[in-house]
Curated annotation (Swiss-Prot):
This is Palmitoyltransferase akr1. SMART domains: ANK. InterPro entries: Ankyrin_rpt, Ankyrin_rpt-contain_sf, Palmitoyltrfase_DHHC. Palmitoyltransferase specific for casein kinase 1. PROSITE patterns: ANK_REP_REGION, ANK_REPEAT, DHHC. Its main location: membrane. It is a multi-pass membrane protein.
Amino acid sequence: MGSLFLAASQGELDTVKNLISSEKIDVNATDEGGATALHWAALNQQIPICKFLLEHGADVNAIGGDLQAAPIHWAAKRGSVKTVHYLVQHGADPLLKDKQGFNCLHLAVHAASPLLVVYLLHLDISVDLRDDQQHTPLMWASYHGNEPITNCLLRWGADVLATDEDKMTPLHWSIVGGNLKCMKLILKEGGIPCTAVTANLSGQLKTPWALASELRVSHLFKQALISNGLKVKETSEEPEKWVVVPSKFQFSQKTFIIFCFLSSFIITGVFFFIMSICPMVISLIIAPLWIYFTFKYITTCIHANIDIVHFYLETPFLAGIFSSIFFWVWCHSLLYIVPKTLPIKPLSSLLFVLISFTCIGLYVRTAFQNPGYVDKIGAVVQRREEISKLLDKDLFNQSHYCLKCFQVKPPRSYHCGACKRCINRYDHHCPWTGNCVGARNHRTFLLFVFTLSTLIPIYFYVAFYYLQNIPIQKKYESYRCLFISGTICQWSLKDMFVLVASLTLFVNWCWVVVLAFTQICQVAHNVTTAEFRLFKRYGTLVPPTKQNSSPKNGHGIHGSFLRTVCGILGLDQCILLIRESNCFVRCFPSRAELGSQNSTSLSRNLSTVNPYDEGSIIKNCKTFWKQNFLNDGRQDEATRHV
């Protein structure tokens, strides 16, 4: 009889058929521990075996094993969504409890399987089901420090103030687990009232702060409190002298975001003022100090009051820097440069004004236009049907389903951590516009980049004639330049603002040209920035099943300072494209890749793994400029071949 259970666990279908069909062994026979063959098949995800056993009368809800569990419990312990789905379709009861008092939802949390948790929740299972000790799934998830599952349960409406037998709340359990992210998530959903919840542990009343202090994680708990507008206050009330109360000054995240954007105008305005008015020696000292201390103050203020992980991506600071530089230079040009150059160079001056207005319009449209948000499905029944379709195609994984949005991810879409939404044909999140670049605004973004890369050289041209035709300011006629001489010295005495602005714009123009070059190459091969990064890392345009968001380090936010700068300016993407050379199709590996047997880029050709390539650069460009990416049925077909 033991051969039946071994064959069922190892997927030996022919052996199982012979043993059952010959009627030598009952299909519901149990081993020494009371488990049936269906238990072992479910545990090891042997769905063909499960199908055969159920067709021959196996009890889908048979109780067995040391923990008196059903086959669906064994499958849930392994986090096998497909097996659980198959058993549910054939009558398995997901609400059954084992000897420990756990049902499938509890076991899915223990198995750290967010996909299984989402699947079970869509079966109309209560998110707050309790075990025999009155623990909810949220308590277990926060105890294990599983942020994705904690987030899923909270998004589904889990009770953050539920208590177990010891009056422990999910917040208490997150403190026991010592996970900062789970603490933040629970506090964000109102996981603690102004008068702190107390837990009765061995006859002692413990508030969350007392428990955090006892477990030596008070520093983490304090960070979580600050990021949610709370603080610890001393009091004489029982059971302890410390309570958690709201901060005296509370500002919404929207207020801080506006502050972050508008402060950039002050920073750059004062910078230009210092560089234009003060002597060069003094300005070269004061201006960098001004930028450093103001930036440090803003970042400290933001991090101390709102929960921000990636400052550059989740705040419009860089968008404010870009907008403010453009604003101050543009205003100076309209007030001083254009009136002087219009009689001398009327065509260039008018062209500068026209293109500058066009550039402003394209920038505003790129920044505020819907990048292509994936429409959310509100009804649970519809979402359940979508999950079932994915399971039938064996596509229910984090590449095709977003755990944060609870929805199917269309082809070429990714979840943006900064925008908190899934984006159709996601290219990248641009910190300089404060918005994602996706299906709806990618063309607008590209037009803006082209326009800006054209506008800056025109500014240099009209600024040159402006400086050539204005006299030295009277207050500077007796001045002498210390570090510069000749024409540059004369220009600095005429209008230092133009020189500083020109140098600033030249630095920006360099990376804008690099960005334009990179985008042209990618459009020519019908590939997005996100897809190219995936190709570089994995040799495919589709992320591994464990990936459910936009590719990590998409802007070089993690790592060294140089990598951060390169990522923000887009230089890293250009370097990758240059290394791919040969029209950016053939990959040439680095020395490290040559020594790695697992490298995916060795002798890899982008065109062979790119299902979206039309076969020629002209066709790819036509597709980009004419095609409606939101209603393209061909992309579904292309995804099947990846």
